[in-house]
Amino acid sequence: MADYSFVTLWRFRAPLADVWDLIYRSEQWPSWWRGVERVEKIEPGDSEGVGGVQRYTWKSKLPYRLAFRMRLTRVEPMSVIEGEAIGELTGSGRWQLTQDGDATSVRYDWNVSTMKAWMNLLAPVARPLFKWNHDVVMNWGAEGLAKRLGVERLNVEES
């Protein structure tokens, strides 16, 4: 397995509630986030979605797809969404949203291991390419969110 830790920071001139709604409703991501091919509900969760499982299929600039299931483990409305991934990527993801004046800041922490043998084999030399690919997909998300809300994207930072 190859381990990866990514931090993505987005900032939009938009109310927190509007940004939260788009991120929280991940089943709608394919309609505005380029690269998200499909989100399928596998198991329902509680009233906030905790315990629910969805299957995600992603396609990026590189010629491969990644699919994994994500179990929602924590929701603090208008603040935090956390989940555990199992599949071709295994690990955890955490969205954190904060309001700062007329802007909303979004931080996404994605700590995963690749499960595809070819990715693990190539990781020592392809790691920078995989990182670039992740950053491209996250940038598509920021672009799509800003466009869907009709708001200004103030910045995107990836690691």
Q: Residue spans of the language-model regions?
A:
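Hydrophobic ligand-binding cavity/cleft-lining segments
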Residues: 1-46, 158-159
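Well-ordered beta-strand positions in beta-sheet-rich domains
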Residues: 7-11, 67-69, 92-94, 109
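Structural motif
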Residues: 13, 75-77, 100
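Glycine-rich portal/gate segments that line the openings of hydrophobic small-molecule binding cavities
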Residues: 31, 40-92, 105, 139-158
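Beta-strand/loop substructures that line and gate deep hydrophobic ligand-binding cavities in soluble
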Residues: 84-139, 156-158
